[in-house]
């Protein structure tokens, strides 16, 4: 698949006037032609449609309004775009030669997940990725199990920066969020009373607090939602549901601490269940429907490759050349090394 993608992009980049013939240049040319026209006649329907097409090929909110983000992309020269394509062609060379017959592909700057089987796209959904200071890593691994009604073992960094300060302000904060405290990170660690932690906080600096484990059980407040999809890796990154559905309405979706939030986790689960006959789908639905159910892990009979990539320029499934914001500044870093 990556070989075909490389071939497609090479054919595109060698085509004469690739950028000047594209929709972004059409929009720019129309704007320049109309500069001397009275203001009320400048922005006609044709130009609005050209702007909308331009916004779609750049991952922007397609409203036809030439806002700051749209202006930023319009102001990119043909030379800059060709260099961006070259950077991504080089990046494609680093990808696995064979992604497998069935795999999950996540392109970070596109904020999108696709599940592909025999070159057909089975699923296509919006995702939320890591913010700039907590970037989602680029790597490949294999999904081996799914966790229903997951507990959230809150990372130590989040505990110290967010949870403990809130606990100091409100002693009932943990109870209101369904968060329990344990003596350590072992699964058999003893539970600790909130008062004990508060006493420790009062006597010590937050950074000196012992390594308690803060765990949030299954609930509507749990940031992992009702399910997570695990492909064990050194980055501790996984795919998961989220209660913050409104974020998927945004064009720019870099908000997480590194994990990938799914807009349609139920569809991914359903697709996996349809093809993995070793899993009792009725039991799965029962677990998800009952609020009293505890965390439950379900193994997959066949592991599914997961590839997390970073392409700011690519050809989509419709053969359209796409550009995206360099959200982690990786293009700038690579450009210094290449040019």
Regions found by a protein language model. Name each.
Residues 1-61, 68-339:
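Well-ordered beta-sheet/strand-loop patches within structured domains
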